[in-house]
């Protein structure tokens, strides 16, 4: 049997690696990215110095997952529409003190913010968009990941 060139051996290893975001339930995915800068403080001794007002810059990754592509378009969701919607949603939080955006005493942890942004996206893609005739209701899963740094992140994912 002839030996394969080293580059082909390396490439063949990558070909067999499945998509990290793929799942048997939702084999298709589309991801978008944006960022926000916020200030906030936490309530409770367990938060130590983070009880004081401090800032954070989040990288925001959103992944839309679906069982099938939208007929005729062959996409999970319109990437331009998704990017615009995410930008509008994030503008509610960007350059804001979250202590003034959410009810008093709400700990706006990274996990909490993932769920809040997810709720805003779900409302847009599953309710508002369909009501305005902007498109069909999105069917699938939305995953919101906020990166605090290259070392720490949080996610919230749910079917919509």
Predicted regions and their residues:
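Charge-rich, low-complexity N-terminal segments
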Residues: 8-160
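Classical eukaryotic N-terminal signal peptides for Sec-dependent ER targeting/secretion
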Residues: 1-8
């Amino acid at each position: 049997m002839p030996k394969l060139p080293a580059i082909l051996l390396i490439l063949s290893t990558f070909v067999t690696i499945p998509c990290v975001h793929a799942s048997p339930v939702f084999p298709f995915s589309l991801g978008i990215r944006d960022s926000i800068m916020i200030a906030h403080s936490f309530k409770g001794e367990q938060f130590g110095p983070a009880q004081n007002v401090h800032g954070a810059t989040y990288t925001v990754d959103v992944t839309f997952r679906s069982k099938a592509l939208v007929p005729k378009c062959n996409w999970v969701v319109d990437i331009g529409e998704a990017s615009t919607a995410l930008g509008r949603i994030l503008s509610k939080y960007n350059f804001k003190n979250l202590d003034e955006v959410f009810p008093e005493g709400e700990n706006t942890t990274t996990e909490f913010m993932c769920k809040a942004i997810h709720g805003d996206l779900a409302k847009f893609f599953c309710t508002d968009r369909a009501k305005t005739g902007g498109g069909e209701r999105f069917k699938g899963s939305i995953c919101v990941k906020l990166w605090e740094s290259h070392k720490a992140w949080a996610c919230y994912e749910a079917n919509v």
